[in-house]
A protein has these predicted regions:
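Single-pass alpha-helical transmembrane signal-anchor segments in small membrane proteins across taxa
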Residues: 13-25
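Non-catalytic pre-domain segments flanking phosphatase-related domains
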Residues: 26, 42, 48-67
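Asp-based, Mg2+/Mn2+-dependent phosphohydrolase catalytic module
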Residues: 55-62, 165, 169-172, 187, ...
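Active-site neighborhood of HAD-like aspartate-dependent phosphohydrolases
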Residues: 56-103
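A metal-dependent, Asp-based hydrolase signature
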Residues: 109-152, 162, 166, 170
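Intrinsically disordered, low-complexity terminal tails and inter-domain linkers enriched
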Residues: 173-185
Length: 296
């Protein structure tokens, strides 16, 4: 018994030394990690700060501002989604909401080269898709309800989103900074795609038409359509800034021709408009419409 205790006492210094070695190694690890975190922060923080600075840095040499309409000046996509939900309920015996919505998107995409965008094109796709998913079994009274759903989108009030009218009114009266002509003001335009009469009616119902020098409604927002807009506004591409919610339609093609762009995401996006986003020196991102005044 005494021999066992004696041997144990002899091992105590060794055990203590091992523990101290482990503690020392752990402390050294923590110190290295702390130093590494600081180094990483030194590398990362300037990037974040520079990115944030670039996002709010004022755009230069701008003489004309073009605005998208739907989901930029007024809400629209959420109404389309409500109609689509009711539509899927009407056709629930022929498939799940997910299946019918997927089939509808496919039908819309197929019809776009011939029908373009807008409520009327959407209504035709609703009817065509109903016939397709039901294999021709959908009843006439259901078709009538579907047509009514589509037509309901033609009578939206197009109420301007928060901050829109106040901001546009400010820009309408604002003098261009660093312009050769001290009294030169921005040219304002609505640049939107869709069906002509529907878009014109929404603009009039919104009450915003009086602020704009040019209203251009196109079948699609291609780079060439942006170049035509520049000619109509009598500005060079690098003197134009496009403001909109769709990266695919409002941002990417504008940047492609050398214009600037301001992206204001809407809370919901049509599946057809979803695309990969990227950064660009002439791109600014804002979350509220009023922030447009900070980048111009």
């Amino acid at each position: 018994m005494r021999n066992g205790v004696f041997l144990l006492l002899k091992q105590i210094p060794v055990i203590i030394g091992s523990v101290l070695l482990i503690i020392g190694s752990f402390c050294a690890f923590l110190e290295r990690k702390k130093k590494g975190d600081k180094d990483n922060k030194k590398q990362i923080f300037p990037i974040i700060i520079e990115k944030k600075k670039n996002m709010m840095e004022k755009l230069k040499h701008i003489k004309a501002i073009a605005f998208d309409a739907d989901d930029t000046l007024w809400a629209l996509q959420n109404y389309f989604e409500e109609v689509e939900h009711e539509y899927c309920q009407l056709l629930s015996e022929f498939g799940s909401e997910k299946e019918i919505s997927a089939a509808l998107l496919e039908t819309e995409s197929k019809n776009m080269p011939d029908l373009g965008y807008g409520c009327k094109a959407f209504t035709i796709s609703l009817v065509e898709n109903a016939v397709k998913v039901s294999h021709g079994k959908v009843e006439a009274n259901v078709i009538a309800q579907i047509v009514d759903l589509g037509k309901s989108l033609l009578h939206l009030d197009a109420k301007p989103l928060e901050g829109v009218e106040k901001t546009i009114a400010c820009l309408k009266d604002r003098l261009i900074q660093n312009a050769g002509n001290a009294s030169l003001k921005y040219k304002l335009a609505v640049f939107t795609k869709g069906e002509l009469m529907d878009q014109e009616n929404k603009l009039w119902r919104s009450g915003l038409q009086r602020y704009f020098d040019v209203v251009s409604i196109v079948s699609d927002k291609t780079p060439e359509a942006y170049r035509r807009l520049c000619k109509e506004l009598e500005v060079n591409p690098d003197e134009l800034v496009m403001v909109g919610n769709s990266f695919k339609s409002d941002i990417a093609p504008a940047l492609k021709i050398g214009a600037s762009a301001v992206h204001i995401p809407f809370h919901t996006t049509w599946a057809h408009e979803k695309t990969e986003e990227f950064e660009h020196p002439k791109l600014r991102r804002i979350s509220r419409f009023e922030e447009l005044l900070d980048v111009l």
